[in-house]
């Protein structure tokens, strides 16, 4: 029976997460992972065929990290339920800049030429339904408002992640409420 691997996929993914959080995903390569794990590159390529396979699995892992961030944010902040996603998105851009850039700028899997394309992305339809219910509008109207809110929020988050904007949570919350009140009459 061969010896049990000392370096697991979980250890590799945690290490890639650490490197990405500190230096950005561009700093991730087999050597940087191996150096941080204090091993050769061989265990990495025992677990993964190549770096592309690792990147693909890491994107899912990083998105789960983001989902946990949103859940933790929801539990720690007292605000309107319809503002949790936009506020947590902007906070993630501020707190986890390198992960935000990876997930929502560089590798964002969104190709929009029409409004309906936004709802082809996994999860957006369900989020829009929950949002519509929380603001008390019909689904089609809620989807239009949710998309507008996303585009507005994404702009603020990108400006935050690139260091161009440094509003505190109260200011951002006020801006989002103003936007929503303009749409919900």
Language-model segments: residues:
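Amphipathic alpha-helical packing segments from all-alpha helical-bundle domains
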Residues: 70, 110-137, 141-147, 174-184
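Short secondary-structure transition hinges
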Residues: 91-132, 158, 162
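Amphipathic C-terminal alpha-helical segment
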Residues: 102, 150-168, 182-185
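Basic, helix-initiating cap at the start of DNA-binding domains
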Residues: 1-23, 27, 32, 53
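HTH DNA-binding helix-turn interface
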Residues: 22-25, 38, 45-55
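Alpha-helical DNA-contacting segments of helix-turn-helix folds
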Residues: 20, 54-62, 70, 103, ...
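Hydrophobic alpha-helical connector segments
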Residues: 57, 71-98, 149
């Amino acid at each position: 029976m061969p010896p049990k691997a000392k370096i697991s996929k979980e250890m590799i993914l945690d290490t890639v997460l650490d490197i990405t959080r500190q230096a950005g995903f561009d700093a991730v390569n087999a050597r940087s992972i191996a150096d941080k794990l204090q091993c050769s590159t061989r265990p990495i390529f025992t677990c993964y065929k190549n770096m592309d396979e690792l990147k693909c699995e890491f994107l899912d892992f990083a998105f789960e990290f983001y989902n946990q961030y949103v859940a933790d944010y929801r539990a720690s902040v007292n605000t309107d339920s319809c503002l949790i996603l936009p506020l947590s998105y902007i906070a993630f851009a501020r707190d986890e800049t390198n992960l935000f850039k990876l997930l929502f700028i560089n590798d964002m899997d969104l190709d929009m030429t029409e409004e309906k394309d936004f709802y082809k992305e996994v999860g957006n339809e369900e989020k829009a339904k929950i949002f519509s219910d929380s603001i008390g509008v019909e689904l089609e109207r809620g989807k239009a408002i949710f998309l507008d809110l996303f585009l507005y929020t994404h702009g603020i988050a990108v400006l935050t992640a690139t260091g161009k904007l440094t509003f505190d949570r109260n200011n951002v919350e006020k801006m989002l409420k103003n936007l929503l009140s303009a749409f919900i009459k």
